[in-house]
């Protein structure tokens, strides 16, 4: 089921046995989403936004009850859903779990999964994370190793790898906080360096005066 921001059913996604995905004909999809387990987003401490339902479901299985997992269904819808979530749940901490579309990048030169995930993260003022697979997995089969569900189902890292990567991302400092800390650290370092530099200048001035007197 696909819901809009008001919780109204707007469409259905059908997944065939071969993995083909279809939406109900002439249905609304833009800015609509699916919340795994129909969790109350207003009570969630962290909201994780991802593309497909399978990815969102795998992420939910790997996290606790303070985390809500939301599927946008496709990369193009990520920024649209991000705008809805940002406006409606400003109290939440957000994380975007993006797809790494290397197969598309190899053919077309662009990576829509990454690009749209980063765009959504900018809207939500949060970080975007992408699955890290075991060495050689992604390079040998681009299509088979794309999202966090692939990490759980197909990678040597498996569900434990998914849980580790997602939970580490949840508990990492937000990107904006890291930038604040970095700026603060540089400012403190600069303020500490100033007295030292002033002392050096004073010493050089004293040395010049002494040398000048001696020459007289």
Model-predicted regions and their roles:
Residues 44-45, 57-216:
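TOPRIM fold recognition
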């Amino acid at each position: 089921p696909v819901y809009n921001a008001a919780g109204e059913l707007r469409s259905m996604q059908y997944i065939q046995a071969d993995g083909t995905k279809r939406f109900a004909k002439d249905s609304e999809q833009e800015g609509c989403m699916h919340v795994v387990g129909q969790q109350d987003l207003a009570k969630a401490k962290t909201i994780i936004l991802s593309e497909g339902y399978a990815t969102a479901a795998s992420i939910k299985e790997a996290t606790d009850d303070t985390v809500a997992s939301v599927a946008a269904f496709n990369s193009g819808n990520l920024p649209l859903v991000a705008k809805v979530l940002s406006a409606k749940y400003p109290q939440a901490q957000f994380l975007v779990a993006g797809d790494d579309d290397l197969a598309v990048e190899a053919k077309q030169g662009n990576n829509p999964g990454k690009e749209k995930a980063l765009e959504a993260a900018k809207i939500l003022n949060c970080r975007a994370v992408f699955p890290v697979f075991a060495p050689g997995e992604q390079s040998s089969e681009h299509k088979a190793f794309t999202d966090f569900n692939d990490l759980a189902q197909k990678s040597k890292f498996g569900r434990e790898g998914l849980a580790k990567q997602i939970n580490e991302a949840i508990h990492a400092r937000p990107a904006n906080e890291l930038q604040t800390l970095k700026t603060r650290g540089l400012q403190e370092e600069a303020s500490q360096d100033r007295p030292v530099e002033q002392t050096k200048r004073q010493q050089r001035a004293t040395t010049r005066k002494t040398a000048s007197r001696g020459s007289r």
